[in-house]
């Protein structure tokens, strides 16, 4: 599970939400440590089919999997997404909310304290010296789990 998904699970739990974290089958063990109430393999259609009505879905990835989740959102439920309203949401009784990053120093400070206290973590994929930035950029472009850190 990537950094955005980890943060979404963490923040949702802080607000008292019943959290179902959607990950690839290969990531289920790792996701269990995040404290979600349920882990759902998004690459397993039978697991998706087992879903009941959902009050809301937060799509932090933007892949085609959202199409299979939309039918499970209850009438007048919420779809929060990073990529705008998907076509599959047209004609459905749900509210689509576009998620945009907003700088907020107080929230970032709170997360920083939680990281320092060991209550929240983001995996580090690899550290590079600043002088080796030419190697970091292609790795970042490929995507993957964990953050790439540049150090002086």
Feature map (PLM): residue ranges:
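Terminal helix/beta-alpha structural elements that buttress the NAD(P)+-binding lobe
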Residues: 1-152
């Amino acid at each position: 599970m990537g950094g955005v998904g980890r943060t979404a699970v963490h923040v949702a739990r802080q607000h008292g939400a019943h959290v179902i974290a959607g990950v690839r089958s290969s990531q289920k063990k790792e996701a269990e440590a995040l404290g979600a109430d349920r882990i759902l393999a998004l690459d397993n259609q039978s697991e998706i089919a087992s879903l009941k009505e959902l009050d809301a879905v937060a799509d932090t990835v933007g892949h085609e999997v959202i199409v299979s989740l939309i039918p499970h959102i209850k009438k007048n439920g919420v779809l929060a997404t990073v990529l705008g309203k998907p076509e599959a949401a047209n004609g459905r009784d749900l509210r689509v909310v576009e998620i945009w990053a907003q700088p907020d120093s107080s929230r970032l400070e709170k997360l920083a304290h939680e990281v320092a206290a060991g209550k929240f973590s983001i995996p580090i994929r690899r550290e590079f010296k600043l002088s080796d930035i030419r190697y970091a950029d292609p790795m970042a472009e490929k995507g993957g789990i964990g953050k790439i850190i540049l150090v002086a």
